[in-house]
């Protein structure tokens, strides 16, 4: 079953603006769909083919004579020597849309690309399926303004808690959301093994797979939480500097998203540590051994998984439109926290996330953000709300809403 990806429209726009297009993202999130998009008029080559890779590495000029644009080059990181020749080609005779490149992770390739193809390349990041893609809803950045939310109500069916936790546990990988009967445990077992055996050895120079696996499981237990490197290191039996470096590896691989604190000169008492979110809740559930959705929903980490899912849905709503997600969070030294702060067009939009159908008094803590409305760098305090399991979109006050999770 083919599920249309929201990023396809963004690809079409960038293709008309840049000579080179790079698609990055974690393994198995659906980058092969671009092979389908390219099938009509674009040659496809993969650097997994040793003969093609050998030609690209030893005779890059000859490679470009053999494979003319428009061209899709898969796993470009395996042939880094080709990048300077791509630059020369597009400078001398390139046209917009000449080359599409795909890469399973960002890592060191991004440094090489930024140096070799600066100003010539459009970069997009593909993650797993969004809720909007699964229900075939139009794409668009999630900004909780009144008009947007009222339109979303018409586009989105109600999502009961049990159905949402089915989706959270299942995860966002296309292979697990297609018509094929893919075994969940077998899929994620293979996924983790591939990551450890190929990516970790190649990109983190880690030879002890078991040690990194312990770290990966420990990191999963922090999803939806502020990171404490010392505690994470103790749990994984490594040093704190190593834990910090390995978490950066997971972020570069696209397995986790580090949500930085929202900063403003008028907010002087906020914590500075990031929060960590696994980009695929199914992978986090597998690593933490939640064996089914019902147990996860009733478990101690259910709220953390709900927050992870909600943050990543909002993140994807921006990234799938080719925008850098304007997300942060704010927590003061009195442990008052706004789970998500969207900074859009001079306004901040505070959001709380609760596993409840009728959370109360959650918007009062939004007042800790009021100092940003004063001074030279003042921002407006825009519409916000509480993402929850309310049966309908309901106003809390003149500015805030109870937002059913299915609207994300």
Question: Can you name each region flagged by the protein language model?
Answer:
Residues 1-47, 69, 248-249, 254-256, ...:
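A cross-kingdom feature that marks ATP-driven nucleic-acid transaction machinery
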Residues 19, 68-70, 95-100:
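Loop/turn-to-beta-strand initiation segments
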Residues 42-70:
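Short glycine-rich substrate-engagement loop in P-loop NTPases that contacts/grips substrate
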Residues 66-82:
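Conserved P-loop NTPase "ATPase switch" module shared by AAA+ and STAND
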Residues 83-107, 114-116:
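Conserved catalytic/switch belt of AAA+ P-loop NTPases
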Residues 102-107, 112, 127-129, 387-391:
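A short beta-strand-to-loop transition that corresponds to the Sensor-1 phosphate-sensing loop
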Residues 107-123, 135-140:
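Short regulatory helix/loop adjacent to the ATP-binding pocket of P-loop NTPases
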Residues 136-313, 319, 323-325:
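Interdomain hinge/linker elements that couple catalytic modules in large macromolecular machines
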């Amino acid at each position: 079953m083919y599920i249309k990806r929201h990023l396809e429209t963004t690809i079409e726009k960038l293709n008309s603006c840049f000579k080179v297009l790079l698609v990055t993202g974690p393994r198995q999130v659906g980058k092969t769909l671009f092979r389908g998009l390219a099938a009509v008029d674009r040659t496809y080559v993969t650097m997994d083919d040793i003969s093609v890779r050998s030609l690209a590495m030893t005779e890059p000029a000859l490679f470009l004579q053999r494979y003319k644009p428009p061209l899709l080059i898969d796993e470009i990181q395996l042939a880094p020597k080709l990048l300077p020749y791509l630059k020369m080609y597009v400078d001398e005779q390139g046209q917009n849309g000449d080359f599409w490149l795909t890469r399973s992770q960002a890592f060191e390739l991004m440094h090489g690309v930024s140096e070799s193809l600066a100003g010539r390349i459009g970069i997009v990041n593909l993650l797993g399926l969004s809720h909007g893609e699964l229900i075939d809803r139009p794409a668009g950045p999630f900004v909780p303004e009144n008009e947007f939310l009222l339109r979303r109500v018409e586009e989105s069916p109600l999502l009961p808690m049990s159905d949402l936790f089915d989706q959270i546990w299942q995860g966002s990988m296309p292979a697990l959301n297609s018509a094929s009967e893919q075994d969940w445990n077998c899929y994620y077992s293979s996924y983790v093994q591939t990551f450890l055996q190929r990516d970790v050895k190649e990109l983190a120079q880690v030879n002890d797979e078991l040690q990194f696996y312990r770290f990966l499981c420990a990191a999963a237990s922090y999803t939806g939480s502020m990171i404490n490197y010392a505690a994470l290191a103790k749990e994984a039996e490594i040093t704190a500097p190593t834990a910090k470096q390995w978490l950066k590896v997971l972020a570069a691989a696209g397995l986790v998203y580090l949500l930085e604190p929202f900063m403003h000169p008028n907010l002087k008492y906020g914590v500075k540590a990031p929060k960590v979110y696994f980009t695929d809740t199914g992978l986090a559930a597998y690593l933490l051994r939640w064996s089914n959705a019902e147990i996860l929903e009733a478990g101690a980490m259910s709220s953390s998984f709900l927050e992870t899912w909600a943050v990543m849905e909002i993140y994807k709503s921006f990234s799938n439109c080719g925008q850098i997600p304007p997300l942060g969070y704010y927590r003061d030294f009195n442990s008052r926290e706004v789970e998500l702060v969207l900074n859009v067009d001079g306004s901040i939009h505070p959001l709380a996330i609760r596993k409840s159908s009728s959370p109360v008094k959650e918007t009062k803590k939004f007042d800790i953000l009021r100092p940003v409305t004063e001074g030279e760098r003042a921002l407006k305090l825009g519409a916000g709300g509480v993402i929850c399991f309310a049966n309908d979109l309901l106003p809390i006050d003149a500015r805030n809403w109870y937002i059913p999770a299915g609207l994300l």
